[in-house]
Amino acid sequence: MKKPLGKIVASTALLISVAFSSSIASAAEEAKEKYLIGFNEQEAVSEFVEQIEANDDVAILSEEEEVEIELLHEFETIPVLSVELSPEDVDALELDPTISYIEEDAEVTTMAQSVPWGISRVQAPAAHNRGLTGSGVKVAVLDTGISTHPDLNIRGGASFVPGEPSTQDGNGHGTHVAGTIAALNNSIGVLGVAPSAELYAVKVLGASGSGSVSSIAQGLEWAGNNGMHVANLSLGSPSPSATLEQAVNSATSRGVLVVAASGNSGAGSISYPARYANAMAVGATDQNNNRASFSQYGAGLDIVAPGVNVQSTYPGSTYASLNGTSMATPHVAGVAALVKQKNPSWSNVQIRNHLKNTATGLGNTNLYGSGLVNAEAATR
């Protein structure tokens, strides 16, 4: 999450909807909201979709009850549907034995050539001197998009934000994150941790800096389907989501190292998705290697990285200094890319464990996890 000279707090404004209809009585259509329906198995998803498509967006629950559903997205790798319903119909649908859960499609927000201090602090130049710059490693930036910039080489991507088909960044957050990962070594601007890594702009947050769980889950699915080695998620929410956890697990099972921001509220608990076991949770430190006051901590924190006054790329071919665990997370994603280049046969789990084992200990593991990510030690 981005903290531009102030505090940006992860929020969960909810975007949900449902519509109730009956074969006996018809009332004025209720306002619809967005939900995620999780099924026990993939076959049940297909059968459910076939039924609502055959009945003009209506699920028939019994002879006397129907539920009007608008299908928004069918996930390929997890048994989940993104739909619009009226809230009154949720209880009726939950009685279907093939449905595991129904949850609101909650909103998730950003956690918001000189060599920036953070790049030096994680000792990335030492790895560069060994010829390790992230070459051949694919890093997906699940964020607000990435703007065209002379200091960035964007290889591709996709947008999962309704109404924003372009992967260009209308906020600034994603472009800043991308620069910390892979700003080019081109004698201008700033230098990234892994300047030769392949950047992919996966837009899951809109210009406002927020987005839905379904968009983020689709972004993770895209990362798994397109052979990404690392996925940077500088975003979070205080609320759990079964769909988002499944998406993290699915991406991890397909070889993606999911690196996520711990959150910016300063609380002694980690935000989601960073709190999930298969996500690598990253906290923020300042120039004195102390925990940044805003950085969330606690059980499940894996590692820390610089997150205060971080200078990086910004839209309009400019540069900006921002604060946040969002700024810390791409330092870790970048070091992961360096390790992957050096050890191309290593799995995401091996890379995650290696980053933790080679981190510089800073004391209290509740505050710092395994310590400060260390590119020099990780690439020896």
From Swiss-Prot:
EC number in record: 3.4.21.-
Signal sequence interval, chain numbering: 1-27
Pfam family, any one: Peptidase_S8
Residue stretches making up the Peptidase S8 domain: 116-379
Catalytic residues of the enzyme: 143, 173, 326
InterPro entries, alphabetized: Peptidase_S8/S53_dom, Peptidase_S8/S53_dom_sf, Peptidase_S8_Asp-AS, Peptidase_S8_His-AS, Peptidase_S8_Ser-AS, Peptidase_S8_subtilisin-like, Peptidase_S8_subtilisin-rel, S8pro/Inhibitor_I9
Cofactor, free-text remark: Binds 2 calcium ions per subunit.
Classification via Gene3D superfamilies: Peptidase S8 propeptide/proteinase inhibitor I9 (3.30.70.80), Peptidase S8/S53 domain (3.40.50.200)
GO molecular function: metal ion binding; serine-type endopeptidase activity
Thermal behaviour (record text): Optimum temperature is 55 degrees Celsius. CaC1(2) markedly shifts the optimum temperature to 70 degrees Celsius.
Keywords of this entry: Calcium, Hydrolase, Metal-binding, Protease, Secreted, Serine protease, Signal
Propeptide cleavage-removed residue intervals: 28-111
Residue ranges constituting the Inhibitor I9 domain according to the UniProt record: 34-111
Regulation: Activity is inhibited by phenylmethylsulfonyl fluoride and chymostatin.
Subcellular location(s) of the protein: Secreted
Enzyme class label: hydrolase
Binding-site residues for Ca(2+) 1, renumbered to this chain: 113, 151, 184, 186, 188, 190
Highest taxon of source: Bacteria
Record-level GO cellular component terms: extracellular region
PROSITE patterns named among the record's database cross-references: SUBTILASE, SUBTILASE_ASP, SUBTILASE_HIS, SUBTILASE_SER
Annotated binding of Ca(2+) 2, by residue: 274, 276, 279, 302
Stated family: Belongs to the peptidase S8 family.
Subunit-structure text: Monomer.
Protein name: M-protease
Organism, scientific name: Shouchella clausii (strain KSM-K16) (Alkalihalobacillus clausii)
